[in-house]
Design a protein with these regions (language model features):
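Jelly-roll (double-stranded beta-helix
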Residues: 1-162
Length: 162
């Protein structure tokens, strides 16, 4: 799916509804320096999936976001990304403020509640009595919120409502 600003593409993992979504989870390759799309009324979280970090400047404040680390910002924010060590990918959660709620955590062990799991590195998860091995970038949808056990690896676990 093309970015709103036309500067890249994301690969949708899940969303609520049609084109007027309430929440959306996607994996996006970031291959060059440039601005993020301005999305008024949308809260955003992203987690870097690859070893190459992402340098983000959010409303004038710059920080380096490494593999498995998160950046959160409002869709109205002025955000510019740089790829100081080459292309990388991020897993992003976008939630329409006031219409839905959502959160994303990074987990390497333990049990967590979630609806969507995206592997950052090769990972083994347990859900609904079964084990699943996920390659980097693989995702699984658990349906309604359920307990997800992370046996090994590093994953993004997303909880959204409705």
């Amino acid at each position: 799916m093309p970015w709103a600003n036309g500067r890249g593409t994301s690969y949708e993992v899940a969303r609520s509804g049609g084109s007027d979504w309430l929440w959306r989870v996607a994996i996006a390759p970031v291959v060059e320096q440039g601005p993020f799309s301005i999305l008024p009324g949308v809260d955003r979280q992203l987690v870097v999936m690859d070893e190459a970090p992402l340098e983000v400047t959010i409303d004038g404040v710059t920080r380096l976001v490494g593999q498995g680390e998160m950046a959160s910002f409002a869709g109205e924010s002025d955000v510019v990304a740089r790829v100081p060590r080459g292309a990388t990918r991020d897993c992003g959660l976008m939630v329409r403020r006031g219409a839905a709620t959502g959160s994303m955590i990074v987990a390497s062990a333990g049990e967590h509640h979630g609806r969507i799991v995206v592997a950052i590195v090769e990972s083994v998860i347990e859900s609904r009595g079964g084990k699943v091995t996920l390659a980097p970038g693989d995702a699984t949808l658990t349906g309604n919120s359920t307990v997800v056990g992370v046996a090994s690896g590093l994953v993004c676990i997303v909880e959204v409502s409705p």
